[in-house]
């Protein structure tokens, strides 16, 4: 069952182009209700959810990344929500959001670009998520290996074959 609303690209589609799947949208509506889905939804990689601890992400880090994902509509257009908006969504002061986002930047998950208005003053920053994508790709490989190891261990257990252990256990 497709729940992301997105199908793999067809042969005649460009590399980053995707096709909406009406069945996927119907599936989301069946789960959440039409009124909820009408307000929008965000695709979140399971790797971000499953490997957040391995990535060294706090709950607030993940919440902020989820908000950035909410505003990231196109791979070539970085999201640009204001710290005020992010703070309102997670119930934190702008100073807390600033510190957390600085940490995400230090860890290489996001890259902040300051934007300035033509008449002077600063506008909302844009946030490139290339670092997050790269780290999730790395973690996805680790997750796949972990799942394969578990699958092999489960098969051994079903056959009654002992699982090899390392010295010191």
PLM regions with names:
Residues 1-89, 95-96, 102:
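Short recognition helix of helix-turn-helix/winged-helix DNA-binding domains
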Residues 106-115:
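A short, conserved structural fragment
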Residues 82, 115-137:
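Short, cationic-aromatic polyanion-contact patches
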Residues 88-90, 105-107, 121-126:
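Short alpha-helical linear motifs
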Residues 77, 92-100, 116, 131-136:
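Short, charged low-complexity intrinsically disordered segments located at boundaries
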Residues 45-48, 113, 126:
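Basic, gly/Ser/Thr/Pro-rich low-complexity segments located predominantly at protein N termini
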Residues 1-37, 106, 131-169:
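Charged low-complexity intrinsically disordered patches
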Residues 98-99, 112, 121-122, 135, ...:
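Short, intrinsically disordered/low-complexity patches at protein termini
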């Amino acid at each position: 069952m497709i729940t992301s609303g997105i199908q793999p690209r067809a042969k005649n589609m460009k590399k980053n182009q995707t096709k909406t799947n009406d069945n996927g949208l119907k599936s989301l509506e069946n789960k959440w209700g039409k009124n909820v889905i009408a307000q929008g939804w965000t695709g979140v990689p399971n790797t971000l959810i499953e490997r957040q601890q391995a990535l060294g992400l706090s709950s607030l880090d993940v919440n902020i990344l989820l908000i950035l994902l909410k505003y990231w509509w196109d791979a070539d257009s970085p999201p640009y929500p204001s710290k005020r908006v992010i703070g309102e969504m997670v119930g934190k002061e702008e100073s807390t959001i600033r510190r957390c986002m600085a940490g995400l930047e230090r860890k290489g998950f996001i890259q902040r670009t300051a934007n300035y208005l033509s008449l002077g003053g600063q506008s909302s920053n844009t946030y490139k998520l290339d670092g997050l994508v790269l780290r999730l790709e790395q973690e996805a490989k680790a997750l796949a290996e972990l799942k394969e190891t578990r699958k092999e261990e489960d098969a051994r257990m079903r056959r009654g074959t002992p699982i090899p252990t390392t010295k010191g256990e």
